[in-house]
Curated annotation (Swiss-Prot):
The modification Isoleucine amide is found at residues 63, 285. This is FMRFamide neuropeptides. One of its GO terms (biological process) is neuropeptide signaling pathway. Belongs to the FARP (FMRFamide related peptide) family. Residues 104-133 are annotated as: Disordered. Expressed in 280 cells of the CNS including the EGP heart excitatory motoneurons. FMRFamide induces contractions in visceral and somatic musculature as well as in the heart. May play a role as cotransmitters or modulators in a number of significant neuronal systems. The modification Phenylalanine amide is found at residues 43, 79, 155, 169, 176, 190, 197, 210, 223, 257, 269. The lineage of its organism: Eukaryota, Metazoa, Spiralia, Lophotrochozoa, Mollusca.
């Protein structure tokens, strides 16, 4: 095989270089697409010249009116006119920037005369000033509406101020604070009767209360012994009438089982009435205050036999 000469090698290299240059000038005429750092296909406006995403021309996938310039800053799938100037905008600018712009004379309101004031042809007349003394319709606001007692979230416009209670701030219901003089301020309040936890002899602490206070009326959800300050006829939540009528143990009220007036406390099982009933004392709550002599003797006999 005959070797190539230096001229042939130089010609091959020149042809290859020329081919690369022509291909680069034909295929990659857009510098945005020819950038090596822009690799991925991206839609929208580029944030920077070094944006690493390849972008198509803005003419693709566009719906709307085309512009005068071949390359416009229009995004994809936009409706309406572009932000770039159109043909009409160019013509308007050329006319307005001419050496002898067209002017027109404004007609005078006086008869037989014409104003000499020159105005631009595209200028608009000055808007008429609005009437300063125009009456403005306002909503009716009486003197009674300015009362401090008529506050937020009130319903109705009745004359009775005391009946407007619900969903009001500063009135009876849904109020927070302490006011011993107002009896109607009860529900959902802190420091009053319902849903109260604490000890205060001077107030009526009734529902959902835990503790011991001789001077207060502690009724519901109460477990324990009675005090001297409580009423004996208070028979709330008794299971039978015999417990309510018995005077031996007044405060044994809730969750009691049995019909005997004797000392049967909580969660006891059995119905026998003989002397061995004291042995059936499982799941009982509380302590006995007094025991009969017969029960004491039975306990002593059982202790000696054991």
């Amino acid at each position: 095989m005959k070797t190539w000469s230096h001229v042939a090698l130089l010609a091959c290299l020149s042809i290859k270089w020329l081919t690369c240059v022509m291909a680069d000038s034909i295929y990659c005429d857009d510098p945005d697409m020819c950038s090596m750092t822009k690799r991925f296909l991206r839609f929208g406006r580029a944030l920077d010249t070094t944006d690493p995403f390849i972008r198509l021309r803005r003419q693709f996938y566009r719906i709307g009116r085309g512009g005068y310039q071949p390359y416009q800053d229009k995004r994809f799938l936009r409706f309406g006119r572009s932000e770039q100037p159109d043909v009409d905008d160019y013509l308007r600018d050329v006319v307005l920037q001419s050496e002898e712009p067209l002017y027109r004379k404004r007609r005078s309101t006086e008869a037989g005369g014409q104003s000499e004031e020159m105005t631009h042809r595209t200028a608009r007349s000055a808007p008429e000033p609005a009437a300063e003394n125009r009456e403005i319709m306002k909503r009716e606001t009486g003197a009674e509406d300015l009362d401090e007692e008529k506050r937020f979230m009130r319903f109705g416009r009745g004359d009775e101020e005391a009946e407007k209670r619900f969903m009001r701030f500063g009135k009876s219901f849904m109020r927070f604070g302490r006011d011993m003089s107002d009896v109607d301020k009860r529900f959902m309040r802190f420091g009053k009767r319902f849903m109260r936890f604490g000890r205060e002899p001077g107030t009526d602490k009734r529902f959902m209360r835990f503790g011991r206070e001789p001077g207060a009326d502690k009724r519901f959800m109460r477990f324990g012994k009675s005090f001297d300050g409580e009423e004996e006829n208070d028979d709330d939540l008794y299971y039978n009438e015999s417990d309510a009528d018995s005077n031996d143990d007044v405060d044994k009220r809730f969750m009691r089982f049995g019909k005997s007036a004797e000392e049967k406390r909580f969660m006891r099982f059995g119905k026998s009435e003989d002397a061995s009933r004291d042995k059936k004392e499982f799941l009982r709550i509380g302590k006995r205050e007094s025991r009969s002599a017969e029960v004491e003797n039975n306990i002593q006999i059982a202790a000696k036999q054991s």
